């Protein structure tokens, strides 16, 4: 514990003398008494099962108190507000070291998670809501500050960059000079005295300010390992970890830099707006139309960081020149005297972008990350991986799907590459879950397992995002530029609607009931997929000509849930999807004419699925054992044409049918592989 104590204490110590502003003696605009509704509104965001702070009050206890005796909390909170000092335990945090990687005996290979008072969090949540309203009313934040702002999304930044690149580079043939800035431990290095001074200068005064001042000047933390906690040490630097106010306070600390950039002439013009910076918390990207413009922006940033005691990681700060061809262009850019690296790709807010703005590289990165997650599930489950398909599909949807569909509210409506990496991985996972070969027809796999293409899910997220933007919800810059240009993100939405026969919904109508309309849009996407897919398997040349006889409704097949024996189930799946070794299929690969694909045991008989089920003499004893009882339950079964028999037997596969297919397949394969006597 001593190693962790010394390490985290060292991180929390300021290297400079602090000059904390004095307490405020005037009544501030945020000092009005709390009401019950404020507490109840803040309590709605509290979740069960969260760890307690030093005072051991858990969320369950607090929520019960809010529900039964809210006025008790109201009196407590108002007393604290009037006194301008929080309860001492609320300024105490317990740091839990979480291992990252590297040698486990090195404390530097751990990150700290700070547990603070849950009751204190509720009080500060009320203050946070007040501060949000105050910052909006007084325009404290710049429109370029997207992060930690209500209803903004990471996709907002991606859409803005997409439209910039498409219009300026692809349409106009210009270049955009950009720099992706990496602040070094930005949240942990904010000087607290400068933060408080800036807040005071913004008009955040009175008791509200004094409470923030009291928390930040008495803040302490100890190291928690198991049930034990070390002595407490002072925290002199950075916004408080785990505090709900911290994201907004960090934004307010940087807002003077953002507004400085806003006032500059060096901007990339798009429509009626100019853009030279986008902030997402501590992720900053700078834009300019010329090299000299970006040099100026970098100089402003360098001076600001020196003045505000922030550090930039120049090794991780990269420059990129957006251009139509996507080639790597090199120009010298410097920050703090260090030459910055020019890159061809950069992972910005979790999605890889390139100089041309193409999305295939980003999709491949998502595919690779999702594949790792899928393989981990597969390796962890071992032999039981295929045991319960519904559970595996739930794991796929909860652990892998969110990774592969990350940022799809941005890219889901864009023109996807023909060899879509996301869809390729989805098909690979579905085929491994079913236990069929890679060559199995994709349409049949999706229908059998009851899945839809992930591209439809991605399109749905994009449409939902479009609904939000159309209703005027989102960042001010985004609302200005999302329609700009012939190849804008909005035009991609229009193309998506047109390709699905829904162009009539592309309207600006305030009276339009968007939730109802979008419900219809989503249903149309699903219907179009199923219509197209069922049409594909019904084609005469389709490999799934037999499958089309009995697969008439979408959804997970019942036998995939009911049959627990993996070997039997996989034999049935392969048989249904024509992923078997009957002559009707193997003849495709060795060039045998369809009319000459004979059964190896029955002279002059075409060996297809119907022959295997109803006629092959080699399987007669198995047929009597497994299929005869089923046939007797279907009146006139023997007089049906083969297409009717297949539909009757395979539409809802009974266990005995599964056993026949599995045992029959294994017997057939054994007899074929057995050496035959010569002569």
Model-assigned labels for residue ranges:
Residues 1-109, 122, 289, 347, ...:
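Surface-exposed loop/turn segments and immediately adjacent short secondary-structure elements
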Residues 399, 421-426, 437-583, 679:
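Extended C-terminal regions of large enzymes
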Residues 12-41, 85, 91-94, 133-189, ...:
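Active-site-proximal segment of RNA-dependent polymerases
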Residues 183-281, 286-297:
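Conserved polymerase palm-domain catalytic core
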Residues 384, 537-679:
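Family-specific functional microsites
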Residues 130, 149, 281-282, 313-318, ...:
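Non-catalytic, peripheral interaction segments enriched in hydrophobic/basic residues
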Residues 48-57, 105-115, 156-200, 611:
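Conserved catalytic palm subdomain of right-hand nucleotidyl-transferase polymerases, strongest
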Residues 29, 227, 311-344:
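Short, conserved micro-motifs composed of acidic
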């Amino acid at each position: 514990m001593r190693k962790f104590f010394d390490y985290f204490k060292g991180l929390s110590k300021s290297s400079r003398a602090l000059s904390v502003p004095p307490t405020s003696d005037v009544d501030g605009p945020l000092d009005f008494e709390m009401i019950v509704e404020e507490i109840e509104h803040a309590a709605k965001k509290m979740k069960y099962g969260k760890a307690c702070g030093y005072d051991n009050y858990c969320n369950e206890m607090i929520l019960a108190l809010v529900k039964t005796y809210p006025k008790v909390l109201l009196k407590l909170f108002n007393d604290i507000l009037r006194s301008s000092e929080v309860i001492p335990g609320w300024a105490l945090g317990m740091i839990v070291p979480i291992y990252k990687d590297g040698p486990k005996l090195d404390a530097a290979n751990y990150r700290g998670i700070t547990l603070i008072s849950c009751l204190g969090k509720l009080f500060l949540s009320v203050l946070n809501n007040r501060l949000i309203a105050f910052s909006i009313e007084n325009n404290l934040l710049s429109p370029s500050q997207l992060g930690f702002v209500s209803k903004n999304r990471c996709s907002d930044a991606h859409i803005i960059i997409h439209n910039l690149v498409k219009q300026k580079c692809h349409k106009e043939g210009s270049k955009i000079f950009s720099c992706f800035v990496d602040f070094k431990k930005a949240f942990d290095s904010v000087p607290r005295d400068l933060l408080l001074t800036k807040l005071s200068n913004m008009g955040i005064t009175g008791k509200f300010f004094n409470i923030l001042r009291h928390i930040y000047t008495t803040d302490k933390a100890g190291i928690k390992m198991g049930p034990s906690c070390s002595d407490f040490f002072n925290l002199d630097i950075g916004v408080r970890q785990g505090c709900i106010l911290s994201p907004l306070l960090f934004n307010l600390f940087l807002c003077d830099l953002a507004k400085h950039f806003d006032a500059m002439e060096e901007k990339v013009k798009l429509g009626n707006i100019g853009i030279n910076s986008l902030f997402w918390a501590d992720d900053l990207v700078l834009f300019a139309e010329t090299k000299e413009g970006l040099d100026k922006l970098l100089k402003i940033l360098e001076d600001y960081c020196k003045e505000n005691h922030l550090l930039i990681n120049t090794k991780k700060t990269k420059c990129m020149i957006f251009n139509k061809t996507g080639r790597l262009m090199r120009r010298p850019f410097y920050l703090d005297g260090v030459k910055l690296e020019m890159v061809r790709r950069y992972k910005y807010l979790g999605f890889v972008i390139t100089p041309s703005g193409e999305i295939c590289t980003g999709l491949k990165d998502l595919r690779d990350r999702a594949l790792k997650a899928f393989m981990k599930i597969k390796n962890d489950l071992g032999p039981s991986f295929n045991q319960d398909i519904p559970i595996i599909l739930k794991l796929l949807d909860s652990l892998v799907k969110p990774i592969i569909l990350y940022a799809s509210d941005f890219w889901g409506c864009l023109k996807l590459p023909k060899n879509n990496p996301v869809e390729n991985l989805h098909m690979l996972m579905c085929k491994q879950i079913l236990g069929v070969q890679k060559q199995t027809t994709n349409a049949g796999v999706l229908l059998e397992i009851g899945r839809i293409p992930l591209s439809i899910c991605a399109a749905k997220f994009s449409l939902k995002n479009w609904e939000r933007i159309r209703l005027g919800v989102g960042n001010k810059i985004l609302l200005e530029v999302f329609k700009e240009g012939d190849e804008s993100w909005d035009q991609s939405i229009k193309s998506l609607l047109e390709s699905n026969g829904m162009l009539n919904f592309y309207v600006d109508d305030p009276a339009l009931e968007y939730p109802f309309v979008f419900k219809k849009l989503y249903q149309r996407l699903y219907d179009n997929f199923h219509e197209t897919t069922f049409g594909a398997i019904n084609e005469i040349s389709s490999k799934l000509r037999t499958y089309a006889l009995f697969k008439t409704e979408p959804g997970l097949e019942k036998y995939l849930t009911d049959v627990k024996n993996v070997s039997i189930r996989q034999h049935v799946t392969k048989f249904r999807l024509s992923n078997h070794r009957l002559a009707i299929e193997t003849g495709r690969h060795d060039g045998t004419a369809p009319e000459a694909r004979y059964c190896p045991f029955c002279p002059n008989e075409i060996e297809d699925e119907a022959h295997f089920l109803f006629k092959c003499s080699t399987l007669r004893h198995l047929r009597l054992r497994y299929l005869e009882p089923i046939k007797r339950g279907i009146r006139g079964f023997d007089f049906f044409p083969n297409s009717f028999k297949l539909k009757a037997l395979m539409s809802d596969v009974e266990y005995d049918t599964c056993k026949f297919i599995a045992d029959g397949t294994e017997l057939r394969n054994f007899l074929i592989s057995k050496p035959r006597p010569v002569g």
